[in-house]
Amino acid sequence: MENGAESILNCNSIKLANLPDFSEVEKLHKATAPSSAAYELIHGHCVVISTISWQIAHHCNMLLSSENHAPQMSDTLRKRAELAKNCLQELVGDSYAILPAISGGLAPKQYIDEYAALIGGLLHDIGTYFVLESDGSSNAGGILRFDGPNYILHGLRGYKYLIDNGFSEDAAQFARNHTGVGLTREQVVVQNLPLPAEDYIPQTVEQEIVMVADKYNSKSIPPRFLTVDAYRRKAARFGEDNANKWMQLVAKYGEPDIAGLAEIFNMRVDA
């Protein structure tokens, strides 16, 4: 597997990702969730991340299209973008019309697959259904709680679950490659994490966007949003290089309006 951001520049604007239908992903969440409480928390988080991922991808595409001598988006990508818009409207309903704008960011070198960003956001945390210490069911007394020591396994468990259920490698990598700001083999070894010693780093722009979007929302109970600064402080616990990488990603993709999103999704904000 290629390592580093350099490989991301040659992404699936050329070869589009093989991804499932929106309805298939929605059915997967319902079939996988062990309880309504688990579904509401995990699927709800994925809806938020899918929304932010789409916003980032769409925003970056608008930045590229506004440049002088910008290339036209291909017909295939344009159709995927329209599909993504329709799916997002189904996900968030009337809130689509009042989604707050993203500020800043850089125009990408190539157009981004907005459908891949949206579907990747919906898929990325499917593995968290398999790291529940208490699953929120009646047998668990309605208590919902994650298994903290094994939570780091959710990406790999989600990846394997998707592959085992016939989903493509393209789809499964959204689950595998979204932890932190990119989890390297070295970090796995140094931190003695219970994972195979490999890189868990985004391999496409769309995977990187989902990884970034994921940092703005937490599946705490109750769930909450995090500002850029709140996640920077969290990233800094693993070293200043980690925090700097986060700020570079924010500069690259822009900053969502977290207060506005929190109001739409009725969640609190950690500033």
Protein language model features and the residues they cover:
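C-terminal/domain-terminus segments
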Residues: 68, 228-245
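Residue-level signal for alpha-helical context at structural boundaries
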Residues: 11, 67-75, 176, 189, ...
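Divalent metal-dependent catalytic cores for phosphoryl transfer on phosphate-bearing substrates
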Residues: 106-232
